[in-house]
Amino acid sequence: MISRDGPLSFTEIMEKLEMNPKTDAGKFGYHLRMLTEAELLSADEASGKYYLTVFGQEVSNFIYGVEDAVRRKKGEMLVRTSSLTIEPFERKKIVEALIREANVPRKLAESISKEAEDRLKRPQVRYLTAALIREFVNAILLEKGLEEYRHSLTRLGQPVYDVTTTIKSAGYKDYPSPERVHALAGDAVFEEYMYLKVLPRTIADAHLSGAIHINNANYWVLRPADIQHDIRPFLCGKMPADGTGIALPSHPAPKSLKGALYTIDALLTSSSALCSNAQSISFFNVFLAPYIKDMKEADIKNILRDFLYSLNEKFNGISNSTIAFNVELEVPEFLEKVKAPSPEGEKGVYGDYSDQTLRLLGALLDLMNEGDGASKPLLNPVIFLKMRKKAYATNAANECLMKAYELAERWGNVFFVNQSLPWQTENVSYSSNLARVDSSWKDWESGTLRVGSLDNIAINLPRIAYGSKGDDDKFDEQLKEMLELAREALVIKRHVMNDRVQSDNLLPLFREEIDDSGYFRLSDSPGLISYVGLPEAVKYHTGLEISDNEDALRFAVKAVRQIDEYSSRSQPSIRLLSSSITFEPAAQRLTNLDIAAGYLKAKSAECYTEHSNLPLTVAIPLKSRLKNEEIFQQITRGGHLFDIRLGEPFPTINLLANYTKRIFETTGIGLLTFTRDYTFCVHCSTVSYGLHTKCPKCAYDGNRLVFYTKTFGRYKSSKAWSQSERDFAFNSKRSAL
């Protein structure tokens, strides 16, 4: 026992031997003294614990050897269990596992266990492991054609070699850390669990074969993709930041801007583990406007600066979600008469704070323009600036708008939302993963607040084109099959999320009631159906390019509209939305699988297009891109982006302003952003515009040059790029206004 468990005290030894201290202490003390006098044991004077001497360890090893030889002669086996103990083999445990884990009938379980025992005795293995026994049982199940039982009995996890590879390669992925290694290993387990236990074989096989791509597979069974927060219950003090007040302190309603921002910081921090990709705060400057009344500009900025630094220290988008603020250039009409939480309680309505709304927005944009102490950009939050019909109505609004264009010109970390379009509805909210929700679902609150994307299924459109061989009816039929798989997967996702919230209590904030419903409106949260490879599918199917042929464009629109109409027909049983955005790079995986399946030749194959309806690696006039994007944005209500990637020299602030105004007044574009590339040299702490392999200032050309650009709609440091993102950054074409 001491050989196995380490040094133990007199009392601990008696407890492990299940001896009674009152009746057995004398007898036990006598035997312990004999072992000590024989120099098999010795006592540590400081701790009072007994340990094996060198001689005692040798005797212990000899006894183990004799016992092992006797067991082998008798045909007995020892098992290293998954609970990290060594126990004699018991066949009944195989029977119990088969019944418990796979619902195998007892008679069949008895038969399989006997066969497994016979096979395990043959190799004369000194120590069996639970994993090895499971492999033998699974092999027997396969031989008997009992594959469904084998599925349920499969042990999840990585082989030893794969774990070693994960450890060795993690230093070259994202931001390396031991926690990142741990997360990568856990990701593999939960992804396998999703394939084997949660999704039907048809859906799992469709993903693994490359017909579809399940985004966030590692978190599919644990949490939704994103959330649109409503900060008002927290500002009122109705709910603690974690929902329960158990994990975090329960604070009273904040009485100052500093307190309000602390509350938001705590909310975002506690919620970062509850969603996979993104968190968004709508009406950020409107809801916080009451807290800056009578404050000086300098005081507002000092408090806000600390808040922004805190966000950027905590949220990098690798180990946790990224943050977006949806901000307004005016108090929307539907909020003007809504009661406003303030330092004095619910005093007044939001319409009373129109001046403060713009003052806070101006301060936020000033600080985002500043960057950090090393003149690098602040990547959090992503700003979505909503431009309603009265966006240019006041001088103060115009000043804020010009600050936003200055941010676009300097860092590019701002997205412009055309809220004046009828199809954008009364209110629209975007997340930093570019998911979109609007008020066409019920109303502006139920549709856009306390909701989030369940997740995203991307359809491999080129695979459908290869199978239909130019036949429109076959294309439509195969697309419908994939849409039905996507819908089924998202329905399952909603059921799983309901279990996590209601039964498993893994998402405590989401289940806490506010206004007679859970904080997270699960039934109002959409599942997204997106697509990859639209231009490639159209080219293969029609032989024509979307960018320069009306027939090709019509076919592309028809395909995307089919996704949108199918999603609409699924309502109201489940809220589904079509999207042109994936939450993670998927195109390279799908391209590689199509190469492996023989649809493409490896040498000539180019990566499919994603996050765009025209290939970004091909030089296409900006006007053509604009014309196409305008059409597709209106039928992809779950997410889209017109990413205007510009080269150097970059346009002036005034040119950006005039261009955006013209687009928003004359086209149907709902969301656009300007992307500017820049390089940060850690060696000399200098930012240079463009992607440079040698620092223009100090000529440094080593690995401390860090590139920044939007990859798939989001600014990321090159230290966090995947290979797909690196290829995207360097191969996508830049335009000029």
Task: Describe the residue ranges of each PLM region.
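Short acidic, hydrophobic short linear motifs in intrinsically disordered regions
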Residues: 7-17
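Short helix-capping/hinge SLiMs at alpha-helix to coil transitions
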Residues: 2-6
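Short, cationic-aromatic polyanion-contact patches
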Residues: 46-68
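A short, conserved structural fragment
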Residues: 36-46, 572-576
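Charged, amphipathic alpha-helical regulatory modules used
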Residues: 68-175, 727-734
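Conserved catalytic cores of very large enzyme subunits
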Residues: 170-523, 544, 549-707
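Long, charge-rich boundary regions
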Residues: 701-737
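Short amphipathic alpha-helical interaction segments
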Residues: 20-37
